[in-house]
């Protein structure tokens, strides 16, 4: 049986991917039996574009481990608009074909978004097209030269899809994520902060540094 992973591309995941790569190189870990699904892709984006999120994922991680390239799957951001719905439906089917997700590994956006699930996303949401919000567009400037070059939409695995994994990891580092992480972990579950839906998962694990955890009650008020 394959081990099936849904993988985000956020910069916060770089240390995680680096550690997994090191363990693979040291023969402590193998990805030969792994199937990887890219969590989201920009839309529309040219098939040959170097800025596709799958290319970022390959450069940061997948090209440096022993995974079979045929076991890497991504949403196609170059399909015609009338093919988007079928593309998303087939992605869901493919995940099921491999027996469902074993693990989801994600970063978090400043609006509490996971993958490209913007505020307002439902806990039942499946893979679909979604409009990229202004805050997310600013965050994506790291990948594109200007905010204007960021495509208007993403094809993303839904919150419901991501949470079908047996284990979900969410990572965040630094002061700029401390307020949002307090809301995600200690606040009410709400679709205005999609990451709060992780509170409903039986095996969700949040990995923070001390700066990102600064506003959590046990850190801010240990007494």
Kindly give the residue locations of the regions a language model identified.
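Solvent-exposed alpha-helices and their adjacent loops that cap or buttress functional pockets
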Residues: 28-30, 65-66, 95-99, 123, ...
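Glycine-rich beta-strand-to-loop/alpha-helix junction loops that act as flexible
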Residues: 7-12, 106-110, 173
């Amino acid at each position: 049986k394959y081990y099936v992973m849904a993988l985000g591309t956020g910069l916060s995941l770089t240390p995680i991917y680096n550690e997994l790569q090191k363990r693979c190189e040291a023969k402590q870990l193998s990805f030969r039996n792994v199937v990887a699904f890219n969590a989201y892709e920009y839309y529309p984006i040219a098939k040959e574009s170097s800025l596709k999120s799958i290319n970022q994922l390959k450069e940061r991680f997948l090209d440096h481990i022993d995974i079979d390239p045929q076991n890497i799957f991504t949403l196609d951001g170059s399909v015609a608009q009338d093919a988007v719905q079928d593309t998303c439906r087939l992605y869901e089917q493919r995940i099921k074909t491999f027996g469902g997700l074993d693990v989801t590994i994600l970063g978090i956006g400043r609006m509490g978004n996971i993958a490209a699930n913007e505020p307002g996303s439902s806990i039942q949401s499946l893979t679909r097209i979604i409009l990229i919000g202004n805050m997310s567009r600013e965050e994506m400037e790291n990948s594109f030269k200007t905010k204007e070059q960021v495509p208007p939409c993403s094809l993303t695995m839904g919150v419901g899809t991501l949470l079908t994994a047996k284990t979900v990891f969410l990572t965040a580092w630094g002061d700029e994520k401390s307020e949002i992480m307090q809301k995600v972990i200690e606040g009410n579950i709400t679709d205005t902060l999609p990451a709060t839906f992780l509170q409903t998962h039986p095996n969700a694990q949040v990995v923070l540094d001390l700066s990102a955890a600064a506003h959590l009650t046990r850190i801010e008020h240990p007494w």
